[in-house]
């Protein structure tokens, strides 16, 4: 029985059933489609740099990208994510809030249907956002819907801390919901060199599980310790290979 419960097929099926059940009970969508990101990026009218061209070319692969600040890693990561479900992982709330604002400005209209922020103070961020939005007619209703879609991982793009998502590696009751969602998502890990040892440990373990479940991973960092690269690329039963590039 334990072998069945721990199998990837079981995790995905149970997780998707839980996700559908949550959505039906809350009268919400299971997923809000990402059909806007590539168009928003194209509207920037930028001439893409080498790092960005590399991510476009290798969009269907798992990536490890090392590059200094100012190379355009953010745009590169979003071009890799394309019009898919995206989780953008950063280590600090300040960095997450800044990335949330950056993506929100990129996608412009109806941001509350496109990009979410997920950390310990999500409610404060949203209340402040909606309070400053003069177009909102029913602030309480708008907040509840936005917050609910965020917590149930229904948003197209979610910028989050690793602890909000990768706690699923500890296999608490109902953990399959998150892992099943990751199985069809693009996971962007930014600045992995800044993670504390404990967070780094369970992040690497989560990455390996997500990879085995079918999710895609792209890691963008200024520096990468050799032991971290070894742990990330160490083969498990069906783990896909990474394309590594140092810019």
Q: Language model features by range: what are they?
A:
Residues 1-247:
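N-terminal helicase ATP-binding lobe
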């Amino acid at each position: 029985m334990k072998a069945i419960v721990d199998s990837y097929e079981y995790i995905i099926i149970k997780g998707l059933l839980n996700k559908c059940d949550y959505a039906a009970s809350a009268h919400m969508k299971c997923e809000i489609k990402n059909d806007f990101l590539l168009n928003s990026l194209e509207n920037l009218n930028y001439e893409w740099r080498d790092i960005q061209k590399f991510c476009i070319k290798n969009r269907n692969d798992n990536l490890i990208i090392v590059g200094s600040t100012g190379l355009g890693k953010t745009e590169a990561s979003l071009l890799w994510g394309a019009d898919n479900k995206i989780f953008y992982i950063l280590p600090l709330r300040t960095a997450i809030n800044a990335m949330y604002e950056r993506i929100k400005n990129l996608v412009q209209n109806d941001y509350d249907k496109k990009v979410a922020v997920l950390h310990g103070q999500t409610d404060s961020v949203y209340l402040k956002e909606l309070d400053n939005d003069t177009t909102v007619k029913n602030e309480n209703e708008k907040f509840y819907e936005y917050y609910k879609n965020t917590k149930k991982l229904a948003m197209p793009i979610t910028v989050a801390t690793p602890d909000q998502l990768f706690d699923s590696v500890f296999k608490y009751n109902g953990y399959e919901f998150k892992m099943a969602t990751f199985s069809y998502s693009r996971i962007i890990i930014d600045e992995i060199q800044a993670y504390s040892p404990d967070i780094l440990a369970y992040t690497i373990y989560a990455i390996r599980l997500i990879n085995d479940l079918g999710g895609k991973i792209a890691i963008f960092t200024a520096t990468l310790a050799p032991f971290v690269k070894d742990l990330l690329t160490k083969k498990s039963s069906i783990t896909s290979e990474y394309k590594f590039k140092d810019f």
